[in-house]
């Protein structure tokens, strides 16, 4: 009897240290696709903070009827779990922050399974600091401190690493969705970018203005979108192979900017966000309908109206309402009234998926406001 108790005590002690069940990610997708998706984004800093009160977030998600959660999954150089291919990138070695968050938030108050999206940030500032040659460049010689070059995304190590990370997330978690954010092509005038432009378009040189400077005309803008689309196709192909084909069910989404003034349905062409081109590879576009206290709810509805008038499949768009008051690095939020009116405007003209971001700016007044438009009493 003493021996049995000793063995039992040893086993319990070992389990309490190892906790193997915590190494197994929870289910991150429900059964049938919901008729309406109400998602809230949890920023990477909240996901990786050991002091995050997940029970409070879960209660608030129930309060507003959120049936999907978008978890920040980090960057290829700063990950939310131990990535075996690049262990030095872990935000906290030995910790799986994504699994911890999903485990805490996976069930609604009625026992339903929430869907999860994992958000991959395409910025590579540390990589650029170590090797400036991978950065997007201007004709003037300016190099971006965050964005990789077009060549790197299409043919280089940065693009390869992004694809590898997306596939690793799919393999480990099998979420409902993997979304890519901060994937812009604003700086594409490097010498390797020119080689790529020549290869992809057959042109001998950049289009140039009368003074000889590069002219970012329609050909260049479309090429930028084709570069991003090529990267998305590689991600899609990689996901399709995950777990002997199970990964084909993972939706591939991409965050996109908005052209508020000229043609909202076309996209932010200067950033490479030509919606029609991107939708050849992405399953869904997440449109940044961020008020920033300078865009009215009527303007948000103007985007959905333009998309519908253009004949777009509205089921392939999510309208994302950002809480930042001025800029996306602002720590001040829009008012509860602006949130209510913006969320209502976002769900117009056939849009069935609306997102609110980020959770770090949500206070009690904003949660109460969101419950007015999303909560059980509002449906």
Model-flagged regions — what are they?
Residues 33-37, 48, 115-172, 210, ...:
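Active-site-adjacent "subsite" loops/lids of carbohydrate-active enzymes
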Residues 60, 149-185, 231, 274-278, ...:
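An active-site-proximal structural segment forming one wall of the substrate-binding cleft
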Residues 78, 176, 181, 198-217, ...:
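Aromatic- and acid-rich polysaccharide-binding/catalytic face
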